[in-house]
């Protein structure tokens, strides 16, 4: 089942109208006339990861290769929303894997990051989901993921710390078990 079945957009629009009304806005004023429709459309876009599957985003782009050395895609920008406040967190992901006979099409790594980032999420889970997806698709000897992000829920509200960055990492297989492999990855993303 798709996350936004037909007709659900209308209820999203109605909910945004109600939110605007509840915060004291005049929903009939000129600047807000189309806001509920635009906000519903934006929310569908920002949460489009619910509409995607791993099979769809990788699209069988797995290729035979004798390479067993590290493959790293660095600085993949990501935009997500925290599940606690529904505020954005923005950053980048570094994803590496050690192939075992198969390599994944380059753009597919970024598409995996996007699919999971475009869901209500916490960064810790996002990092793990990316790593496990790459592992599942490639059957790699190891996968490493580091995500660095700035969280609007910490910058705009609460403690209001604008210069903090959260860093999470997940190491699977050889990256977890072999300190030299892990160190090589970490040195490459500096």
From Swiss-Prot:
Say which enzyme class the record assigns: hydrolase
Query: What family does this belong to?
Result: Belongs to the GTP cyclohydrolase I family.
Q: Which domain of life is it from?
A: Bacteria
Query: Which GO BP terms apply?
Result: one-carbon metabolic process; tetrahydrobiopterin biosynthetic process; tetrahydrofolate biosynthetic process
Keyword list (alphabetical) reads: GTP-binding, Hydrolase, Nucleotide-binding, One-carbon metabolism
Cellular compartments per GO CC: cytoplasm
What NCBIfam families does this protein's entry cite?
folE (TIGR00063), PRK09347.1-2 (NF006825), PRK09347.1-3 (NF006826)
- The gene name on file is folE1
Which GO MF term does the entry hold, naming one?
Answer: GTP cyclohydrolase I activity
State what protein this is by name: GTP cyclohydrolase 1 1
The catalysed reaction is: GTP + H2O = 7,8-dihydroneopterin 3'-triphosphate + formate + H(+)
Q: Which HAMAP family match?
A: FolE
Subunit structure comment from the entry: Homomer.
Tell me which Gene3D superfamilies the record gives.
Answer: 1.10.286.10, 3.30.1130.10
């Amino acid at each position: 089942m798709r996350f936004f079945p037909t007709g659900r957009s209308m209820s999203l629009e109605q909910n945004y109208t109600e939110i605007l009304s509840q915060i004291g806005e005049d929903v009939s004023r000129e600047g807000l006339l189309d806001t509920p429709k635009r906000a519903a459309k934006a929310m569908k876009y920002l949460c489009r990861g619910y509409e995607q599957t791993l099979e769809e985003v990788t699209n069988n782009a797995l290729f035979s290769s004798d390479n067993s050395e590290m493959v790293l895609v660095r600085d993949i920008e990501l935009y997500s929303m925290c599940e606690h406040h529904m505020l954005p967190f923005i950053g980048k992901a570094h994803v590496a894997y050690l192939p075992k006979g198969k390599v994944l099409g380059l753009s597919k790594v970024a598409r995996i990051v996007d699919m999971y980032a475009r869901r209500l999420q916490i960064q810790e889970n996002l990092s793990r989901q990316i790593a496990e997806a790459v592992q599942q698709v490639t059957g790699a000897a190891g996968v490493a993921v580091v995500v660095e992000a700035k969280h609007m829920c910490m910058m705009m509200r609460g403690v209001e710390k604008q210069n903090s960055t959260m860093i999470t990492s997940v190491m699977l297989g050889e990256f977890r078990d072999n300190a030299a492999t892990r160190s090589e990855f970490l040195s490459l993303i500096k």
